[in-house]
Amino acid sequence: MSFNHREIEQKWQDYWEKNKTFRTPDDDDKPKFYVLDMFPYPSGAGLHVGHPEGYTATDILARMKRMQGYNVLHPMGWDAFGLPAEQYALDTGNDPAEFTQKNIDNFRRQIKSLGFSYDWDREINTTDPNYYKWTQWIFLKLYEKGLAYMDEVPVNWCPALGTVLANEEVINGRSERGGHPVIRKPMRQWMLKITAYADRLLEDLEELDWPESIKEMQRNWIGRSEGAEIEFAVHGHDETFTVFTTRPDTLFGATYTVLAPEHPLVEKITTPEQKPAVDAYLKEIQSKSDLERTDLAKEKTGVFTGAYAIHPVTGDRLPIWIADYVLMSYGTGAIMAVPAHDERDYEFAKKFHLPMKEVVAGGDIEKEPYTGDGEHINSEFLNGLNKQEAIDKMIAWLEEHGKGRKKVSYRLRDWLFSRQRYWGEPIPIIHWEDGTMTPVPEEELPLVLPKTDEIRPSGTGESPLANIEEWVNVVDPKTGKKGRRETNTMPQWAGSCWYYLRYIDPHNDKQLADPEKLKKWLPVDVYIGGAEHAVLHLLYARFWHKFLYDLGIVPTKEPFQKLFNQGMILGENNEKMSKSKGNVVNPDDIIESHGADTLRLYEMFMGPLEASIAWSTKGLDGARRFLDRVWRLFVTENGELNPNIVDEPANDTLERIYHQTVKKVTEDYESLRFNTAISQLMVFINEAYKAEQMKKEYMEGFVKLLSPVCPHIGEELWQKLGHTDTIAYEPWPTYDETKLVEDVVEIVVQINGKVRSRLHVPVDLPKEALEERALADEKIKEQLEGKTVRKVIAVPGKLVNIVAN
């Protein structure tokens, strides 16, 4: 007999909702445990089977910790601003807010149908003005502290769409939607000074319990390198430019210099003879992204400006070139080229027949550049020194002569924070006609996104908000001065930078969150989500958290103590699930056919949580069969509790396996090894089926262990066992170390290395007694007839080997 999952799951979901079973109190003196999911973007497609994998993992932890006596914070919300809703609005003419609300309602329904123990009273939505009031407030604080500023930045401008595109929306120089040409165009943009926190973002990674691979990705993204800044004067001009290099020791090997095409000097120093070639080159590279420009595999391109730099030590004239492999956004937008000792410079010099000068011995520069350490040559006062000595000496010389200085550089750029979009948080700034700008006063927050039935690009590169005259145009009541509101909106990252803080105090209209509550709940103990957010979301959230720490708002330096990335669930054909491939599995269908408990159990049993594994209908059927076996063990055909579950069985055969199961399952849940925990639950059920009678205490313990994974059947079996309250707060089972060990052990008896018999003997039987038992065994006596025993080797607890001939 199998159980009716539809009936049982509906019954318990209704019970939890009605009784607010999972409401988290703030005034509790139990120890706290904050377990967080990366909240989803509520897309039109709804939940797919990949979402519940991470959500089930956090739910198992939340449910176990409640039973272990913790006050658990386990919330859910919606990261609901973002491009797809805006694109939908552009395509259909519908309001993105309505579309988003409909999607949220569908996501919430789906998530509730999976039986997760969220405290729905704490639900948040990044598009709710009561929420983004505080996103705007954080922006104003950043602005006050000089960490939000405006700058000219080259952006991806698509003339056909009349809008600026994010890097992710540009593929090979064309827009992802419609395939229109995209060019790089400088525009005034809001920037956040994340670089001010670069060192702390790097150093504090050491204190976190995160996967090493994610820490390494963040380290590389921040990209700290030590070196020197060197000043070069331009021959015949009253201009200088600065280069950053990690190898100032090779300065004597510099034979030319290169400026990024966007460098402000390009216009000033290009000679009339070279101007046509330079203009043609600038036009040609307009459509290339930074990624394409710095691709090591591609052929180097460039053009000579006609101007020369003066070598800061020797006074030699070095030609100044322009090349797209130098980015304005990295270092200073200018490099000194040392082709004998740098791969990119070498390729470039070879292509354009520029001179090379060897200054570090040890390689053969006819064949390839030498980038290793070695003795310096052709380098005046650096000759004979190794790399580090030469670096130190050159920096000292540059500083003494006012030609340069020691410098730390980062690959990390300031965060381009504005988007030319409608569907995002308005940036609370007013630009006045006299060229000044002021923040919207705090008491006027939230600055609400105006409703409009016409979301279309402005065509000027501004966001669609620029079209809403009555919202954009303002007059200062004190002075009568006219102004325009900022029409750019914040990126989707903004709302997700601090949402974990708002869950702690979601209805507070006086402050971001009550400091006492923040002190109680932070940091997040476990954060689970996909590895695709390894860098940006986690880096941005850490940046905002550190900023709020500096303001004295949060009590911890870091937001997320332990991070775990679940793997991806692939289609049955081992490909990524996608609509276009037709291999998407909808959880609604599985809940209907197999039940939410089966889906949860299957996703946790598929393999290690971090692995990417293909969906298998056979595996899903197997999970359901296991739950049916569990049900039949507890419940008779007529729905009563199995009479063989008794308080005191005549023969307690399950004691050892029960204690082993409690130990293994508890340890495995704690360390997120859910697949091996479930294997152990299966072992217990197999043993229980062999027992004539089962001790009720063990069967109750088993149900408690199963309930975090399969909460509906857990509650139902708990009720069948005679309880009237929810299982959610019952104490977690404990095990007795002394009961884990077997008192009888199986011994193998060999003759001349071949197994001839097996004995069951007490675990602590000494060596001599073991030999006697082996030689007295009937099977062994038979085998030894007519032979002489030469030697007996006994290993207690393992084997006896008899040598005879």
From Swiss-Prot:
It catalyses: tRNA(Leu) + L-leucine + ATP = L-leucyl-tRNA(Leu) + AMP + diphosphate. ATP binds at K579. It is found in: Cytoplasm. Its EC number is 6.1.1.4. One of its GO terms (biological process) is leucyl-tRNA aminoacylation. GO terms for cellular component: cytosol. A motif ('HIGH' region) lies at residues 40-51. The keyword Protein biosynthesis applies. One of its GO terms (molecular function) is ATP binding. The keyword Cytoplasm applies. It holds the Pfam family tRNA-synt_1. Keywords: Aminoacyl-tRNA synthetase, ATP-binding, Cytoplasm, Ligase, Nucleotide-binding, Protein biosynthesis. Belongs to the class-I aminoacyl-tRNA synthetase family. NCBIfam families: leuS_bact (TIGR00396). This is Leucine--tRNA ligase. It comes from Geobacillus kaustophilus (strain HTA426).
